[in-house]
Amino acid sequence: MDPPGSDVGGSIADPLTAGSLFACRVLRDGMDTAPTRCTWPGATDALYLAYHDEEWGVPEYDSRALWEKLVLDGFQAGLAWITILRKREAFRAAFDDFDPEKVALYGEADRARLMADAGIVRSNAKIDAAIGGAKIFLEMRDNGEDFADFLWAFVDGKPVQNVWPGTGQVPVTSPEAEAMSKALKKRGFKFVGPVIVYAFMQATGMVNDHLEGCFRHGPVRAMAR
């Protein structure tokens, strides 16, 4: 989520390249029948458009899926989210489909394997953060804590429904993201600065930041439990 030159903890980021944190603007892609959508996916990249139309902002309640997204957002620090999106399947293959039981057991041979894998973002610090995060995830589970419940508690279990008319109103963080970031860091998670965390919250539907003019705003709002 963070642009080049930001701090390694991911607390500073450009909102237009910050993971799934996107300052949405309404865009019509040039076709009369095209839906009105946020501008950040552009109008030509099918992968990006599908991510916006099908995934971004949809409430996610599965603990393992949430952990995967948090790990990927950490790997995105310093890069554009589309880079990670294009490598997502390679990441899943490299990290045993983000099975925390397996990732938590990774040793030096696995670290070397991952650092040699050109299909993913190769960073010792980020790889170590993923392995460490898997261990924390399992510790929480073994102590009777559900990861999804832990995260959703920061928004009282319900998505924050924003109604932004334009890009300038969309924030890069929030009090809830600040609190979640602080709690994740206290647990030992890495690459979880408040800007990264807010992007994570947007992407996983804890916050609905599709602009009110985007065709996905209403459907995403209706998905809230």
Model features per residue range: what roles?
Residues 5, 9-10, 19, 30:
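Residue-identity detector for glycine
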Residues 21-225:
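HhH-family (HhH-GPD) DNA N-glycosylase catalytic core used in base-excision repair
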